[in-house]
Amino acid sequence: MTGWIVLPISLTVFSIPGIWIVYAMAVMNHHVCPVENWTYNLTCTDDNTKAGTPKSCCTLEDVPLISKCGTYPPESCLFSLIGNVGAFMVVIICLLRYSQVIEVSQRSWLNTTALIAGCTNAAGLVMVGNFQVDYAKSLHYIGAGVAFPAGLLFVCLSSILSYQIAASALDYWLGHLRVSLTIVALISLVLSGVFFIQESFLMQHLAAICEWIFVLDILVFYGTFAYEFGSVSTDTMMAALQSSSARSCKSPGSSSTSTHLHCNAERIAMI
């Protein structure tokens, strides 16, 4: 058992309540309408709703998409913080998971692709969190267009890798759980995209709900790594470094055995 088990749990525990707080602040500040509202108007006159209570008149601009919830201050400040801190945690989790797979299995293109997808997901999160949709729409949509598909690709590949390195019945059970979460993520992301491009009030509201389901699902998926991270040690990161060093030592036409002996001799000489 190591302290790394706290990392994926922290990402889930920090991010899920965090974005709900952002949503609650946006609703109370009349920046979006509550998710349970299904009635929208083309236009609204001055809304006389009291401060601290949800809006009574909603338009298409008030649909509670996650991006809209984090557009205006003060909730935009918390939204950016969650995006930045969450992205940093995602990168560390992806690096640890990459190293852990190498430690128990051989290097594979699936593992490398999963690492790239996870880091790309983190980069997109930074853009989404720091470029609000109403002020930098192009950059915000680029970030979302990068973060969401990359996040989906990461969970897909991670689910496959879970089965490849499974060693116990509990490992396979966790693989089944991750596949279920991946299916939910795939369906919700596709539906969110389909609904979002429609101009109907109902479709836009459904897009917001699907977007929330997707994000919450991905955060829960990251939290499942707490199970494997209990076995992370100093040898875990060294496994990735040694694998990289071994590959860099290889030269065309040289045998595997002679190459390893040559590299080991070089390391000893350096010491």
From Swiss-Prot:
Residues 25-75, 130-140, 204-205 are extracellular. It is found in: Cell membrane. Residues 1-3, 97-108, 162-182, 227-271 are cytoplasmic. This is Transmembrane protein 150A. The gene is tmem150a. The keyword Plastid does not apply. The chain crosses the membrane at residues 4-24, 76-96, 109-129, 141-161, 183-203, 206-226. Its main location: membrane. Keywords: Cell membrane, Glycoprotein, Membrane, Transmembrane, Transmembrane helix. Belongs to the DRAM/TMEM150 family. It is a multi-pass membrane protein. The keyword Cell membrane applies. One of its GO terms (biological process) is phosphatidylinositol phosphate biosynthetic process. Regulates localization of phosphatidylinositol 4-kinase (PI4K) to the plasma membrane. InterPro entries: DRAM/TMEM150_Autophagy_Mod, Frag1/DRAM/Sfk1. The lineage of its organism: Eukaryota, Metazoa, Chordata, Craniata, Vertebrata. GO terms for cellular component: plasma membrane. Glycans are attached at N37, N41.
